[in-house]
From Swiss-Prot:
Entry protein name: Protein CDKN2AIP homolog B
Bias type Basic and acidic residues, positions: 183-193
Key words, A-Z: Nucleus
Family: Belongs to the CARF family.
Record has ATP-binding as a keyword: no
Gene source species: Xenopus laevis
Length: 413
């Protein structure tokens, strides 16, 4: 059976064996894969049933025959889809198939090769499709100081491709930098994020919070903006007042005491995400690696469902997040946040719910390109105040400016 012609001739002379083979063929098995797997079975069938013997029906639970069929699937999956198995199993099936010539087998990228390739590219792919936030011109020394405070506290995009940097000069990004993006700024600088926020008036000049609130009250025609999160008090002690909240952010939430997460929360969830990491990594290898045409939502969803868990998806209008950088063009955007087992995975922002969800899934999947993922306790903004949250990050994680939480993290645990 050195060729397809010889296999066809053998099956023509042994119709009972041909009929038996059709019964063990997989329902969704392609003709090419079945052609080679069938040859694998025929080459080793005599070792199980004896030379010239008709194999027993599949439902008889013949152990040796079942083992042969399993080996044939292992060999086909390894050759044609890149599946990896223990070295002893691989050596066994390769020995059983040593005389089978496969001329059109695809090439596959292993997870280690994939990680090395991503590292070689640097961080350029992690910010794909994300544009820099615009920097406004300084109107005066006073406004200039305030503007620099706003820009310093805005998420900065690093290592962005040149064409994306050119586009970003006049518009805000549709996607938000996820929690997995590396940001080398010191963690303590995050505490000053909301000391000064300003809204734009009709002539493009920044207004203090109190003026912005009154100037943006006419609704529906231009769409309303929430007042910025914090305005400066006039008192000499330079303390800051409570942020102005939108309709969905009640004063009751602001008065609730903040709970604290402990290492027990992270230890309890880490084993699950270790298993999820392996599942996603192998699915990426089977799909030929991370690419723009990959269905990130399906890949992550099926991986989580295979571990008997549920992915939590939350949507909220961008204008309802007072801590999220906004401009006039982004008022109607939607923010999507992904969680699993109350752990934050990623966030996306877009003009539609589908766009926001696609960005969030893409950024979440990118996290699994790293060598390891860990659950950590990080600081995020919620309703204008700092709260603790459980966040999935890579082992080389440095505290970045995480986007504000859509829901109170402590109410999700």
């Amino acid at each position: 059976m050195a060729s397809e012609d010889e296999v066809s001739e053998f099956l023509g002379q042994n119709p009972e064996t041909a009929a038996w083979l059709e019964r063990v063929r997989g329902q969704c098995e392609s003709d090419k894969l079945w052609r080679y797997r069938r040859e694998f079975i025929l080459r080793n069938l005599s070792d199980v049933c004896g030379e010239g013997e008709i194999p027993p029906p599949p439902e008889t639970n013949h152990k040796e025959l079942d083992r042969l069929l399993a080996y044939s699937m292992v060999w086909a999956n390894h050759v044609f889809t890149g599946c990896r198995y223990p070295i002893q199993v691989i050596e066994k099936v390769l020995k059983m198939a040593e005389n089978i010539k496969v001329t059109d087998a695809p090439t596959h990228t292993t997870r280690d090769e994939l990680v090395a390739k991503v590292k070689k590219r640097g961080n350029s792919s992690s910010n794909e499709g994300v544009e820099e936030l615009p920097r406004k011109k300084k109107k005066s020394n006073d406004h200039g100081a305030r503007e620099s405070s706003y820009i310093d506290d805005t998420v900065e995009i690093r290592n962005q491709p040149g064409d994306a940097r050119e586009r970003s000069s006049g518009k805000i990004c549709d996607g938000y930098i996820p929690s997995t993006s590396l940001n080398k700024r010191e963690a303590h600088s995050r505490t000053d994020v909301n000391t000064e926020f300003y809204e734009e008036s009709g002539n493009g000049r920044p207004l203090p919070v109190s003026k912005a609130k009154s100037s943006l009250n006419p609704p529906e025609e231009a769409g309303y903006k929430h007042a910025a999160t914090q305005g400066r008090k006039s008192h000499s002690d330079s303390r800051y007042q409570t942020a102005v909240k939108g309709p969905s952010q009640s004063s009751d939430n602001a008065l609730k005491p903040t709970r604290r997460f402990t290492t027990e929360h992270t230890k309890e969830r880490q084993p699950f995400f270790n298993r999820l990491y392996k599942t996603v990594a192998w699915k990426l290898v089977s799909a030929g690696g991370f690419n723009a045409n990959l269905n990130h939502e399906e890949l992550l969803n099926t991986s989580i469902e295979s571990l008997k868990a549920t992915l939590e998806i939350a949507f909220v209008p961008l204008k309802d997040l007072a801590d999220f950088p906004q401009n006039k063009t982004s008022q109607e955007n939607t923010v999507c946040e992904l969680r699993c087992k109350s752990v934050y995975l990623g966030m996306g922002c877009g003009k539609t719910m589908d766009t926001a969800k696609a960005v969030a899934f893409r950024e979440a999947v990118k996290l699994f390109l790293k060598k390891k993922v860990v659950v950590r306790i990080c600081r995020r903004k919620f309703n204008g105040r700092d709260v603790e949250d459980l966040v999935l990050v890579d082992e080389e994680f440095r505290p970045p400016n995480l986007p504000p939480a859509v829901k109170n993290p402590h109410e999700l645990v």
